[in-house]
Structure formats: C-alpha cells, structure tokens
Amino acid sequence: MRRHLILLGLAAFVTCAPLAAMAQEYVLTIKDHKFTPEELKVPANQRVVITVINNDSTAEEFESSVLKVEKVIAGNSRGTVRIGPLAPGRYPFIGEFHEATAKGVVIAE
C-alpha cells in the first residue's frame, strides 16, 4: 500500500510539474504590414510564448536581433516564437519584409 501511495504521489508530481513551467502566451497581430500592439508588455525573468497572427495575404518575418529570433509567418496564418526569460528592458522587433511600417517592442517589466 505504501508503495502505491509513493507511486501515486510521484505520478502527480510528474504530471503537474510541466504545468508550472509553462510560459505565458501573448498575441501579436499583423494587419496592413503593422504589428498590433506595437508595445507588448511581458513579465521580466519569465519565459513567454508569442503567437504572431498574420492577417495580411503576404508573408512577414518577425525578427529581433536582441531577442535572437527570426520567424517567417506565411500570409493568413500564424506562428509561434518562444523568448526569455528576459531582464527588465525594451527589446525592439521588426517585420523584415516591411521594415518601414512593421515595427514594435517587447517591454519586459
């Protein structure tokens, strides 16, 4: 009986541990070659997942040299990037295919 309780406790720990490590999810939308929101606030010192939804018919590349990420998002589709943990600060990003209009910043606070 004691062995069963230990195994049950271990199974519960293994099952719940990944939930605690899950990153918070944030959404960026691309429309008319612009990111919305232009400023994305995320918690500092935590991993985050950014889902980029491209509502334009053409592809866009989410790129940030300081975040060390490049991800091409096809037109009318979505993609996911994982970043962090980030120290408090501002981390600019661009849409490389439309740099004049597709700009934004991740703000870790």
Set out the residue ranges of the language-model regions.
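Sec/Tat signal peptide C-region and signal peptidase I cleavage site
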Residues: 16-23
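Histidine- and aromatic-enriched segments that form or immediately flank copper-ligand environments
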Residues: 57-75, 104
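N-terminal post-signal-peptidase region of extra-cytosolic proteins
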Residues: 31-38, 66-68, 76-81, 92
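Extracellular/periplasmic metallocenter environments
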Residues: 27, 74-109
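N-terminal edge beta-strand
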Residues: 23-45
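Bacterial N-terminal signal peptides that target proteins for export
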Residues: 1-9
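Exposed beta-strand and adjacent loop surfaces of beta-rich binding modules
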Residues: 25, 47, 57-61, 90, ...
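Asparagine-centered strand-capping/turn motif at beta-strand->loop junctions
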Residues: 52-54
